Every structure is written in C-alpha cells, then in structure tokens.
C-alpha cells in the first residue's frame, strides 16, 4: 500500500468529518435562534441537509479509525510509514494516535449503532447515554483528528492541505441563511 494514497484518503475523510460536522452544527445550534423562520420556510431542504450532514460526519470520522488492514485509515497509514520513520518520532506519533483513537471510540460506536448499522433495539438516546459524551467533546475529537491528519501530511498551517479552518463552514452556513432572509 502506498502511504501517499492512504494519506490523500485520510485528508479527504478528515475534510469530510470536519466539514459535515460544522454545517450540521450551524444548522442545529448556531442558526436556530436567528434563522428558525427561514429554516421552517425551507423545511424539507433543512431536514434533509441536517440528516445528511449528521450521518456523513460520523461516517468520515470512522474512516480515520477503521482497524481493517485493507482500509485507508490512520492505523493502516501508521503501519505503512513505520519502517521509513525515525523510531523516536514514530513512537510519539503512535502514542498520540492511541490517545486520539481512545477519545474517538465513542463516535465510532455512534457510527456503528446509529448510522451504518442501525441497531433495531436502540434509540439515539440509548446509544449516546452510556457514552457520556458532549457535543463540545465530539467537536473537539473531530477537530483534533483533522489536525492530526494535517500534521501527518506536513501541513505548515491549518487549511494548507484542504481541510477547512475551524468554523469556516459554520460561518458559510450562517451566511447562506442570512442571504435567504
């Protein structure tokens, strides 16, 4: 497996997770107080959009942490670069990945039980309840995962490899809603 191909896939997945989360969050939280009338006027669109962005953010984030050896994931990428990376640097990368993977595990559970393989016996509340995770923590995990991918790609600054800067898509969503008023 080529590390460059895997890294390109990781950038795509990190971009997707962050972008879809930001657009979903803007619609579900930031926009509600000021733009509820516009959102109600275009109800069908916003319901479909909210659902699509919600599901996509969990799917893209789960790509990053997929443990299958045939997937373009962080574990696969680390395996691919192990022999060509300084051992001390690799240990640091691996330790940081392990900490991030532990934090992301609840979101992979959400993806499995609510998005990809909808559990017939569990509601959204049943899935999220035992995970004891807040939306602020979810945002932090998504943003930290994207930053980790940017770092692996050698990005000199946030946004350099195409992953949007934090909040950019929320701002764009709110700008669109203001234009619809």
Where are these regions (language model features)?
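Histidine-centered, metal-coordinating catalytic motifs and their short helical/loop contexts
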Residues: 97-126
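Amphipathic alpha-helical interface segments
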Residues: 1-103, 128-181
